[in-house]
Design a protein with these regions (language model features):
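Metal-coordinating catalytic core of metallo-dependent amide/deamination hydrolases
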Residues: 1-120
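Residues in flexible loops and secondary-structure boundaries
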Residues: 101, 132, 181-184
Length: 186
């Protein structure tokens, strides 16, 4: 691909259409609604994201790309990135997290079920179901497997949040206003 010749990093979300279709089939078979609460644990679980990462790793190596490994949340994905870095692959690994993830890892700091935007006091509910493996994540940060800490797309404003339409829900709101201070200080 053209990007390989330019020395740029290629970053692709570690998921594919087969994964999404498998979630759809699972929900139908179990008679469950197509809601974010039902979709996210399956779409962003260790098996799905790690499998997507292995496919990306194959593509990256085949085409001699520099890889920006996004959303390194799960043990299987982290183990893959760690192994490939040890083999000399040029990988920039990032952890895009939410204040909800951070607060879930440190429940002693969680004083509410809402997130408050400091500028105007607007409140939105907390919640994310990706279920990161926090012991593995922070070990990877400390050892240098993860290079970048960033913020994820969420949280969602109530007006943009459509839990019954998970593939049409808004990608979220600007993170700095809502939780930049938490990411930097938590």
């Amino acid at each position: 691909p053209a990007i390989a010749g330019q020395g740029k990093y290629c970053g692709i979300h570690p998921s594919d259409e087969r994964c999404r279709q498998a979630v759809e089939r699972r929900l139908r078979a179990d008679g469950l609604p197509r809601s974010l609460a039902q979709v996210l644990p399956h779409l962003y679980g260790d098996e799905e994201m790690s499998a997507g990462a292995w496919l990306l790793a194959y593509y990256v190596r085949k085409h001699h790309l520099r890889w920006h490994a996004l959303h390194c949340w799960h043990r299987g994905y982290l183990d893959l990135v760690r192994m490939l870095k040890a083999q000399g692959e040029d990988i920039l690994a990032s952890l895009e997290l939410l204040p909800t993830n951070t607060l879930a890892a440190h429940p002693e700091n969680r004083h509410s079920e809402e997130l408050v935007r400091p500028a105007d006091g607007l409140r939105i509910p907390l919640g994310h179901t990706a279920g990161p493996d926090w012991d593995a994540v922070w070990a990877a940060v400390r050892e240098g497997t993860i290079d970048i800490l960033g913020s994820d797309h969420s949280p969602h404003l109530p007006a943009c949040y459509r839990p019954q339409e998970p593939f049409r829900s808004s990608a979220g709101v600007p993170g700095l206003d809502w939780y930049g201070h938490l990411l930097l200080n938590e």
